[in-house]
């Protein structure tokens, strides 16, 4: 049995958070002790789901101040009391505070981290690079979720034997649905599943609605910082789209909502390996995504890519798919076939193999 602690800032909506909800029970069911430590333990649907699945969840605080220096002491105190074979971090604050806290603790715990994005604004700040290089050097293994993420991190910290790639995964069986048939003149429902954060490009999808007929409807699933949510809702009103766009917030019935949709979209400025893209591609609906790093590798050759930030190009490609039933069906089929390659069971097996390799090295 391996004792594993995963550490993440919170369980708000996001790809890394959703990965843990799917991954941790599988790691536990393989005969291991798998716990989770949150910097911000505020109650969320993801936290509730993990607790219902029997995962032990610890919290450092109930505040959204993950970079608070007090968290360094809190991590140190927690790791002093609890011993694990593997400590697996996610997100920058956790990646930094965990190795810092270990400096004064005599422990044999091996550190593993996952890079969940192909882009990080910190890497443009030259004065942070020495700290980042020290931080990454403390890890026995650094998991990148895609080829672009791997290349970008290799360029930043230099080539290292500790860098590997393990793709994210989802429970594809929960999302696989029969491919839908589009009927002439029917209402078309477009769905985008993404946290309302700066890296996502909801603005372009909203503006694309201005180029689509009135029978096209749009729904956003996800939440985020209140100021960003408010900004997008204000833009929706300014564009006169309030009667055609629905902000649905965080939902636990995403697979059912995708089943009722006709086209799934992900508009983003950058991505790692998006779990919502895998879910969307598994749903039996054509998947249309921004032509950006992370999505390009995932969607290219299966779904449809549109020019980053080009609302007219997005609208044209959505409408073309819906007006050409044969192509609609072919794209949906290709998307489902691609999604099956990213089942969470495959991801779990690769992480378990990695843990054994790290402990035996």
Regions found by a protein language model. Give the residues of each.
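Short hydrophobic beta-strand element within catalytic cores of glycosyltransferases
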Residues: 37-38, 286-289
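N-terminal strand-loop element at the rim of the active site
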Residues: 6-70, 224-227
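A conserved nucleotide-sugar
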Residues: 31-34, 202, 206-246, 323-326, ...
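Short His-centered aromatic/hydrophobic patch
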Residues: 89-95, 115
